[in-house]
Amino acid sequence: MSVIVLDANAVIMHGRAFPERVHAAVETDAKLVLPRSVKQELVDDVLNAEDAPENHRAAAQAIQELIDEGYLVLRNPDYEAYSDVIDEARRRIANDSLPEHDVKADQYIPALVTELAQNEAVTLVTADRKLRETVREITKRQNVADQVTLSDPLTVL
């Protein structure tokens, strides 16, 4: 079974086809992991926003259904064990236009990928160059880089 971690842009890039592609991936024995921080951003925050556009609400509900049906597995990194990785990721992802306190879901992804890669091969699906570079550097230093593959969203799902 392959373990595939999805970031927010990996979900967004597929648009309305996302549920169909998730079903197809799971049928080929893939385990699709959605970080809880990504779910917060794409589902919870949207459904809690009264002024969210209807198409955003529909997309959020579709993602929630995939979670409820077991097609997407929610995971958090072990915050205590990987707090240094989370802090480093937040610093690396932040820049002049995005202060550290505004870095949201992506800061947890390198820690989750590193944790999962301790026991199995992991594919991170993202088009975000900064996140890719951060994961590449951190997993190399954590001695799990050989267990991690970085893939473009349109090539995996």
Task: List each language-model region with its residue ranges.
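Acidic, PIN/NYN-like endoribonuclease modules and their adjacent C-terminal/linker elements
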Residues: 118-157
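Active-site-proximal, substrate-binding regions of enzyme catalytic domains
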Residues: 2-116, 131-133, 137
